[in-house]
Amino acid sequence: MSLGPWEIGIIVLLIIVLFGAKKLPDAARSIGRSMRIFKSEVKEMNKDGDTPEQQQQPQQQIAPNQIEAPQPNFEQHYQGQQVQQPQNPQTPDYRQNYEDPNRTS
């Protein structure tokens, strides 16, 4: 299904009627600006994407030679010790500083 000259003319006429002749140049300008911004962002992303790959290659060569230090086992260290519990736990009284806003006195 191809568009002939009549169909294209009708579509252009509908766009002019819907958006108005005054708004079309502004819309075209804003679309052009958006495309330029989009292209510049894509270029920056491509630049940023190239540099980390180059930096990662030397790090990958160093990584196999590194040896991790053994981690201490904390369970064995504290296994023989008893945990001391507080003798008289006090529950706080939350009502001591509370003033009822609905109370009339």
UniProtKB/Swiss-Prot annotation:
Stretches the record annotates as Disordered: 41-105
Top-level taxon in the UniProt lineage: Bacteria
Broad class of the protein's primary localization: membrane
GO BP field: protein transport by the Tat complex
InterPro entries cross-referenced by the UniProt entry: TatA/B/E (IPR003369), TatA/E (IPR006312)
Membrane topology: Single-pass membrane protein
Physiological role: Part of the twin-arginine translocation (Tat) system that transports large folded proteins containing a characteristic twin-arginine motif in their signal peptide across membranes. TatA could form the protein-conducting channel of the Tat system.
Known partners and oligomeric status: The Tat system comprises two distinct complexes: a TatABC complex, containing multiple copies of TatA, TatB and TatC subunits, and a separate TatA complex, containing only TatA subunits. Substrates initially bind to the TatABC complex, which probably triggers association of the separate TatA complex to form the active translocon.
Family note: Belongs to the TatA/E family.
Name of the protein in question: Sec-independent protein translocase protein TatA
Source species of the chain: Corynebacterium glutamicum (strain ATCC 13032 / DSM 20300 / JCM 1318 / BCRC 11384 / CCUG 27702 / LMG 3730 / NBRC 12168 / NCIMB 10025 / NRRL B-2784 / 534)
Gene, per the UniProt record: tatA
